[in-house]
Amino acid sequence: PLLQLNQIIISPIHQSVLKSSILEGMMAKKVTAVSFENLKDDSDSYPIVRSMSEIAGSAVMLIAAQYLGSANHGKGVLLGGISGIAPTKVIIIGAGIVGEYAARAALALGASVKVFDNNVYRLKRLQNNIGQRLWTSVIEPRMLAKQLKTCEVAVGALGSQTGRTPMVVTEEMVGNMRPGSVIIDVSIDRGGCFETSEITSHEHPIFMKYGVIHYCVPNIPSGFARTASQAISNVIMPLLLEAAE
C-alpha cells in the first residue's frame, strides 16, 4: 500500500528472500527498483556489498561473544582468551571479505582462528591482508568435521556467484559439535552453508538444534543501522550527484 505508481526505489532488494507477493505488487504498480547489492563501480566490483560484508564480518564476533555467554544458554566462555586459559577456537568457512573481517575481529579478541576455503588464492590474500600467519585449509570434509567437533564458534561466510551457496557442513557434522557452541551462518541469504540452517530474524535471531545455537539472520548489517547507513551514503551520494549533473 505504500508503493506509488511508477515510483523509483533505491534499496537493497535481496531477491533470494524476496516474497513473491511483494514482487508482484511492485510489478503491478510499475515500480523501478535499483538494487543496492548489484551496483558496480569503475573497477567492476560491488562497493556496497563490500561495505556490508565488512560490517557483517566484524559483527559476527560480537554476536558470537554474546551467545557464548551463560545468560544466552551458551557454554559460558569468554570469546578470546586470558592468561592461563586456552583461547576460544573459531572456525571460519570462507576467505572472502566477511571471512577476513571476522578473522580480524576474532584475532583481536585473542581467539584461535582457523579458516577454510576451496580457493587457495583467497586464502593467500586473506593471510597477506591480515599480515600474519593463519591456520588455513581447503574444504576437505573429514578435516572440517574434525575441527568443528572442538570449536566454540563456527562462521559460514562462503559466497556464490551463480546462486545458492555451497552447503559444506552436514547435519551429522553439526550433531557432533559441542553443546552450547555457536553457528553464525552469514551465507543464509543465499541458502546457507550449514545443512541445519533456517532463516531467522532480528526479533527471533536464534534457534537450538543438537544443542548448538544457530544464528541465521539474513541481513546482519541492518542490526547496526547507523553504521550501515553511513557506509551506504558514502557510496550512493557520489553516484547520485554524478547522475544529477
Where are the model-predicted features located?
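Phosphate-coordination loops involved in phosphoryl transfer and adenosine-cofactor binding
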Residues: 5-6, 86-89, 180
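Generic hydrophobic/aromatic pocket-lining and core-packing "Φ" positions
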Residues: 23, 61, 102-103, 123, ...
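Glycine-rich phosphate/diphosphate-binding loop of Rossmann-like nucleotide-binding domains
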Residues: 71-159
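Adenosine-phosphate binding glycine-rich loop
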Residues: 37-79, 188, 193-245
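Rossmann-like adenosine-cofactor binding region
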Residues: 128-210
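Short, ordered loop/turn segments at secondary-structure junctions
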Residues: 14-15, 31, 38-41, 118-120, ...
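Phosphate/diphosphate ligand-binding glycine-rich loop within oxidoreductases
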Residues: 1-67
